[in-house]
């Protein structure tokens, strides 16, 4: 279907002149960015004219728009094209945007600033907003714990512990920290049970929220020091007096006495109350029994996020020595997210707490093992720096001496295992098995292997160590330690995995947001455009002469493009309030329109006699097929020109015109117009 185009209306008048001026400026800017050959100093575009011959336009097809047309363009403001159905309604009529707090919560509920301003209503007579008195609207929407005028849920709120957004609040009338964690109707309050996760001795009000925020902050680093277990313990000790630590020591001693075979360090505290305070309790218990030894190597314990403990006596379990596990010196208390496992030794405790709060062994540096950490691994062998194990100890991470070691005359160590429901960490003494003879303790290698992580450690083909007869700790046939080190079962990992999934979803959402959603009304038209007109482009180029020296003088060359021949396929798409336009390459043009018409036209023109020579040269999709150019150098004197048709300059200019056209107007490049 042919389309008649009123060429004079499009190109004439002030609008046509402005459009021609913009095209001239555009071509001039492109020539300034082109690297010029040595013999041309500069190129300047002076004028552009559309001419009087219109192009021939034929509609070929109506299809769906190309996918690239739906891509968001940051340079174009899309706020003006937002439709009413895409705008999110504000939840509450009359909410205002003066208050920064209101702005924060308004955006969290999904309301845009412009929509909020449009729906802003103020009662000018009383000066109140959604309230019964002056500034009641401002005060009512503050967070409940910052609102001194909040009445505890009186009025329309059905639940006294919910604010207007359905969030729990702490009753402002509750004194101290001993009140319920989430309002007066919270029935868990302070029950003192280590399994409910709401209370810890010395921390009234519970530590369930404290643990969650603190241990997550080890990976996100978003909380201040006042929200750490150390600060909570200090605050509790300040409230209850200096006797609190003594009570903890007494409780620790009672737990130690529960272990068969003698004193054990036991797990210290519950629900994140580990760290230095528990370390002090364990150290005091061990000191009273005289178990410090200055002749043993030092074992340095470090509490991530809390501080570094002092070196305490005891051999390193990762060095080449074959020291019983039970004779580790005094160690710090177990941190941990809540309940878990504690290992008690002779008057001390070998902490096996779960990261990020369990003590991390800082072994003297030796040959290091480097590996790439995986996203599924929190506790990594690569996080430590152990020395190379002795050959006799390569069958397990914690290796033992031979079973024929001479019996020890000293009291045998006791190991307490306290198993909780939420991983490895703090939890008091448990039932322990007693090693009554001299053989050393050994933990099989597969019991401490790391799951769900990528490691370059070569697997040990020797299998499990045969020194099981002298070990009274555990047998890993049931995969007990495998469960200990299954990171996905740990609350911290369970919390991190959804965060990773959320990050992936956000990335996918951002990728989807780069493209708009197609609509039924989106349309695209495919045209075949033929043009053999008298479009004019005037430009000058300065030619440098190298005689008698390089770049001796520059001579201006005037170039005039007086017409061109064009045959191509154009695409115009209308998407919402934008119009996209481009030409297709010759290959895409043939695929979109078909080459049969082009073949028929070529054969028809070839059969003609003496006519249609221009038509025989045209090829559909060939775009710029011919450019007519005139050039002259110097000034006219007595009707003569000094020089015409400088070949090199003409070829360079025509080549650049073709390149600019193809780079700027041929798909995947396209032009967008706001309508």
UniProtKB/Swiss-Prot annotation:
Keywords: Endoplasmic reticulum, Lipid transport, Lipid-binding, Membrane, Mitochondrion, Mitochondrion outer membrane, Transport. Residues 78-101, 497-510 have a biased composition (Acidic residues). The keyword Transferase does not apply. GO terms for molecular function: lipid binding. PROSITE patterns: SMP. Residues 261-270 have a biased composition (Gly residues). Residues 373-382, 454-469 have a biased composition (Polar residues). It is found in: Mitochondrion outer membrane; Endoplasmic reticulum membrane. Residues 66-186, 241-270, 307-327, 365-390, 444-517 are annotated as: Disordered. GO terms for cellular component: endoplasmic reticulum membrane; ERMES complex. Residues 123-137, 317-327 have a biased composition (Low complexity). Component of the ER-mitochondria encounter structure (ERMES) or MDM complex, composed of mmm-1, mdm10, mdm12 and mdm34. A mmm-1 homodimer associates with one molecule of mdm12 on each side in a pairwise head-to-tail manner, and the SMP-LTD domains of mmm-1 and mdm12 generate a continuous hydrophobic tunnel for phospholipid trafficking. Component of the ERMES/MDM complex, which serves as a molecular tether to connect the endoplasmic reticulum (ER) and mitochondria. Components of this complex are involved in the control of mitochondrial shape and protein biogenesis, and function in nonvesicular lipid trafficking between the ER and mitochondria. Mdm12 is required for the interaction of the ER-resident membrane protein MMM1 and the outer mitochondrial membrane-resident beta-barrel protein mdm10. Belongs to the MDM12 family. This is Mitochondrial distribution and morphology protein 12. It comes from Neurospora crassa (strain ATCC 24698 / 74-OR23-1A / CBS 708.71 / DSM 1257 / FGSC 987). The lineage of its organism: Eukaryota, Fungi, Dikarya, Ascomycota, Pezizomycotina.
